[in-house]
């Protein structure tokens, strides 16, 4: 429906409402799914206030319009992140794409933690809880104004969408503090000996630890600490990490590594040295029996070395899985994975795999 001229005209009336309530607007930020809303708003402001910038906002994992504008033609995404499901569109409309090429001033991409931080900001300000797609434009406006140091200008962000899905709240709260840089997610390795954890706590000092997972790793004779701390000043965090590293406690900042935030921080068993181990993230519909069907496709043919899954209240679920697959069988494995029809990505390049999970 977003590619119909009548629908676009109807959505364009939002521009009329904005213009009635506020004049001399520097920029209007619009969430982009199929492109109907931004096409209508841009068409209106081009006629009545051409000085106002119209900027679209998409999640990194659903950037179909951004990629299409960059390539100069419509591009269909193979995988679409459904965290902000209201704007999770694989292919933008033909008519809306042409309108965006002609009328809009740019696009901004936002991470899921930035969207979550925007939801928290709106709640703190007015006790309203937006759904994820409804907060996309606010996250984009905040990122844009920070990057370009825009102050003392009238900025509008369109908060579209319905009500928050209750089952998604826990993930939003997990990501919100990280997205606003009010918390940091860290991993520290320390030599395991009596008193070492106490020394670690002293080095963290006055920074408040809001979550901690501590696990002795016998193969390395080291303990792994995964933890979150409140951050008032970025310089304080940097100084703390510097003190830990100089005390032979190697520390990594994973604050904006969504793989760690979503999966790896829950894997407290330490690292393992497993030959031919590969890791993959698979996306499949959240319905009864899907996980069992997924696992049956690989086991016992290939040994499953790791599995982490949690219902997030999305249309689709995200599961992190480890497999033992000899290089000689990789083509066969990929063929089996392709046959399932679920989007997936095999990726051992994320530094968190090698630091926290793999030996």
From Swiss-Prot:
Q: What induces it?
A: By abscisic acid (ABA), jasmonic acid (JA) and wounding.
Q: Which GO terms describe its biological process?
A: isoleucine biosynthetic process; response to abscisic acid; response to jasmonic acid; response to wounding
Q: Which InterPro entries match?
A: ACT-like_dom_sf, Ser/Thr_Dehydratase, TD_ACT-like, TD_ACT-like_sf, TrpB-like_PALP, TrpB-like_PALP_sf
**UniProt pathway:** Amino-acid biosynthesis; L-isoleucine biosynthesis; 2-oxobutanoate from L-threonine: step 1/1
Entry's EC annotation: 4.3.1.19
What residue ranges are annotated as transmembrane? none
Cited Pfam families: PALP (PF00291), Thr_dehydrat_C (PF00585)
Subcellular location(s) of the protein: Plastid, Chloroplast
Q: Does the keyword Plastid apply?
A: yes
What Gene3D superfamilies does UniProt report for this protein, alphabetically?
A: 3.40.50.1100, Biosynthetic Threonine Deaminase, Domain 3
Q: Which keywords does the record carry?
A: Amino-acid biosynthesis, Branched-chain amino acid biosynthesis, Chloroplast, Isoleucine biosynthesis, Lyase, Plastid, Pyridoxal phosphate, Repeat, Stress response
Molecular function (GO) terms for this protein are: pyridoxal phosphate binding; threonine deaminase activity
Is Lipid biosynthesis set as a keyword in this record?
A: no
Which reactions does this protein catalyse?
L-threonine = 2-oxobutanoate + NH4(+)
Cofactor(s) listed in the protein's UniProt record = pyridoxal 5'-phosphate
Stretches assigned to the ACT-like domain? 184-256, 278-349
The cellular component terms of Gene Ontology attached to this UniProt record, alphabetical and capped at eight, are: chloroplast
Tissue pattern of expression reads: Floral buds of untreated plants. After ABA treatment or mechanical wounding is mostly accumulated in leaves, to a lesser extent in stems, but not in roots. Expressed in anthers, carpel leaves, pith cells, sepals and petals. Not expressed in stomium, vascular bundles, epidermal cells or pollen mother cells.
Subunit structure, per the record? Homotetramer.
PANTHER family assigned to the protein according to its UniProt record, in alphabetical order: THREONINE DEHYDRATASE 2 BIOSYNTHETIC, CHLOROPLASTIC, THREONINE DEHYDRATASE, MITOCHONDRIAL-RELATED
The similarity comment for this entry is: Belongs to the serine/threonine dehydratase family.
Q: What is this protein called?
A: Threonine dehydratase biosynthetic, chloroplastic
Q: Gene name on record?
A: TD
